[in-house]
């Protein structure tokens, strides 16, 4: 029986092939994570010239800080809104293209445009549209008697950053959902149609279970996106306000580490955020992935 395992002429070639990825991982993940863990156990002066070992004192102080706990729950709420809304909206548009306006190249191109926009630019775009004094959308809302001012209303500020973040991520999710729907064998869809199943029933009974692995992958990706990659949106749109209503953990880390120069506290917050994302990812892979396997 022949083995399908590749054979290299040189024993060092496999190591050379994986070396670039290992170097990148060490430099951009393991090293910074180690530095953050070391600083989280120290009391560091604002300029980082001297430090003193304090053990877990930074973490104890952290979880007794009401502002940090508020940011923690804001992050959970914000990430849930962005992840769930982004997946549902993207799946809806992908199904719309596949089952209703299939073949519309213009529509598909239009759906991919937000992916080419930088997160900060996306935030600025929606700030212009939601500007309390001159925004097109706020003018439209005013016609119905709704007063919009996200600089003073915490609920409106949260809606703005969630909306901008979801809009920025729609293209990415749409691309994967649309490709997954396209990969479903046409024979299954045609057989269901012959049996009298309508478009909605075909989608929920056939398409949705078959694209479950892609949905799980996007769930993990969108969760990480909401935790980390939405920082430019929040910074450009609300700067964490009003009254820290949109201050997430990643934004609080930036503000205390780079603005307040509290290196020890920001490092401790980074470690907590890192372990939180790792735990959530492991839980998803353990308990969610097992439910999306199909023959």
Swiss-Prot record:
InterPro entries: MetI-like, MetI-like_sf, UgpAE/MalFG_permease. The keyword Ribosomal protein does not apply. One of its GO terms (biological process) is transmembrane transport. Residues 1-11, 102-109, 178-207, 284-295 are cytoplasmic. Residues 76-284 form the ABC transmembrane type-1 domain. One of its GO terms (cellular component) is plasma membrane. It is a multi-pass membrane protein. NCBIfam families: PRK10561.1. Part of the ABC transporter complex UgpBAEC involved in sn-glycerol-3-phosphate (G3P) import. Probably responsible for the translocation of the substrate across the membrane. This is sn-glycerol-3-phosphate transport system permease protein UgpA. It comes from Escherichia coli O1:K1 / APEC.
């Amino acid at each position: 029986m022949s083995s399908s395992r590749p054979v290299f002429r040189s024993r060092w070639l496999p190591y050379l092939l994986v070396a670039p990825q290992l170097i990148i991982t060490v430099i951009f993940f393991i090293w910074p994570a180690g530095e953050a863990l070391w600083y989280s156990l120290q009391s560091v002066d604002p300029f980082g010239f001297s430090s003193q070992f304090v053990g877990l004192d930074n973490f104890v102080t952290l979880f007794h800080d009401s502002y940090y706990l508020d940011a923690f729950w804001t992050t959970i709420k914000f990430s849930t809104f962005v992840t769930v809304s982004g997946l549902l909206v993207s799946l809806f548009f992908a199904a719309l293209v596949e089952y209703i306006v299939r073949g519309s190249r213009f529509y598909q191109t239009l759906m991919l445009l937000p992916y080419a926009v930088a997160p900060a630019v996306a935030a600025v775009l929606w700030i212009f549209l939601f500007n309390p004094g001159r925004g097109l959308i706020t003018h439209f809302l005013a016609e119905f008697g709704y007063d919009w001012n996200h600089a003073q209303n915490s609920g409106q500020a949260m809606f703005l950053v969630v909306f901008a973040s979801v809009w920025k991520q729609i293209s990415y999710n749409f691309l994967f959902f649309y490709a997954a729907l396209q990969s479903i064998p046409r024979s299954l869809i045609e057989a269901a149609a012959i049996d009298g199943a309508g478009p909605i029933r075909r989608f929920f009974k056939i398409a949705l279970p078959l694209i479950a692995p892609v949905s799980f992958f996007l769930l993990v990706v969108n969760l990480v996106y909401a935790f980390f990659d939405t920082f430019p949106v929040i910074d450009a749109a609300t700067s964490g306000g009003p009254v820290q209503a949109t201050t997430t953990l990643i934004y609080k880390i930036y503000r205390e580490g780079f603005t307040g120069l509290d290196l020890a506290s920001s490092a401790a917050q980074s470690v907590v955020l890192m372990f939180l994302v790792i735990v959530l990812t492991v839980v998803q892979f353990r308990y969610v992935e097992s439910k999306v396997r199909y023959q």
